[in-house]
């Protein structure tokens, strides 16, 4: 059996990209409406944006209630990262460093370097334990220049699949805040 782990796309046992029944049904429903297909608003479908905010922040989040959350629908995960990287570059001081995990999805480096950032790595995977090098990660967050950006995989860390538990997330967020760092969450899955 061959397994292609290079791209986050599902292939069937014949190596073909299948049209899933749920996708076919959704397309049939859209086609049955005979509605015109215009451009979406610049920030995407408002109902989708609101649903994403509730999913990520909780439906009763004060951030949503106070209208402090901004959500924009993007073209795929890479498109969203590119928009975020460009936005950060525009508002970050010259010389700001972006830290990506070691190892990381290699597109992280390419996207942030293309936006004009210097990219470094923070310790993440511990090959000896097959877990997170948690102390190394915290030490890097604390030692980095304040205002540095830390790209964090919210779940399904790419490429290791090793995630932080809730208690570790609490410590990482406290360390980021205490050290004056900027978290940048990649929620790919």
Where do the PLM segments sit?
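Conserved N-terminal helix/loop that builds the PLP phosphate-binding region
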Residues: 1-28
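Active-site-proximal loop/turn and secondary-structure-junction residues that shape catalytic pockets
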Residues: 9-11, 104, 156, 189
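Hydrophobic, well-ordered secondary-structure scaffolds
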Residues: 176, 188-189
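Conserved core of the PLP fold type I
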Residues: 24, 28-29, 34-182
């Amino acid at each position: 059996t061959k397994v292609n782990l290079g791209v986050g796309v599902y292939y069937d046992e014949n190596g073909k990209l299948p049209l899933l029944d749920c996708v076919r049904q959704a397309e049939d429903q859209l086609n049955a409406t005979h509605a015109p297909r215009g451009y979406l608003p610049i920030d995407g479908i408002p109902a989708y944006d609101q649903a994403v905010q509730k999913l990520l922040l909780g439906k009763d989040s004060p951030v949503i209630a106070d209208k402090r959350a901004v959500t924009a629908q993007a073209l795929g995960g890479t498109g969203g990262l590119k928009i975020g990287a460009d936005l950060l570059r525009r508002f970050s001081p010259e010389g700001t460093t972006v830290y990506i995990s070691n190892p990381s999805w290699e597109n992280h480096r390419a996207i942030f370097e293309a936006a004009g950032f210097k990219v470094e790595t923070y310790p993440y995977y511990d090959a000896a334990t097959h877990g997170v090098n948690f102390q190394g990660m915290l030490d890097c967050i604390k030692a980095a220049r304040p205002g540095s950006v830390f790209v964090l995989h919210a779940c399904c860390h790419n490429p290791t699949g090793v995630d932080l538990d809730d208690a570790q997330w609490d410590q990482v967020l406290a360390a980021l805040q205490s050290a004056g760092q900027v978290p940048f969450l990649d929620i790919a899955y």
